[in-house]
């Protein structure tokens, strides 16, 4: 049981760190498109929801059509993405 909780905690923190590295607003905002580069194998929104559920983490869709600012090599892109907010990470870590 401890190994499972440890693995979940590591995965949850990886999720947060990856979101932060990509400059997403707030530490818990993620999107399917943002996870392609970190090789989590998420190909769709359903993949994201299944993966988050396996961690015991709640994921809810934000307002459709929200935009994020993506800074790549000093170039700012204002792009629409399907954002999801991840909550209850504390439960995973405990």
Predicted regions and their residues:
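Structured alpha/beta or helical-core interaction and ligand-binding surfaces enriched in interleaved
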Residues: 1-94
């Amino acid at each position: 049981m401890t190994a499972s909780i440890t693995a979940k905690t590591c995965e949850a923190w990886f999720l947060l760190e990856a979101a932060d590295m990509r400059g997403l607003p707030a530490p818990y905002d993620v999107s399917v498109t943002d996870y392609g580069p970190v090789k989590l194998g998420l190909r769709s929104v359903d993949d994201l929801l299944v993966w988050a559920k396996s961690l015991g983490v709640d994921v809810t869709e934000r307002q459709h059509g929200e935009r994020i600012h993506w800074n790549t090599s000093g170039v700012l892109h204002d792009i629409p993405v399907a954002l999801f907010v991840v909550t209850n990470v504390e439960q995973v870590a405990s």
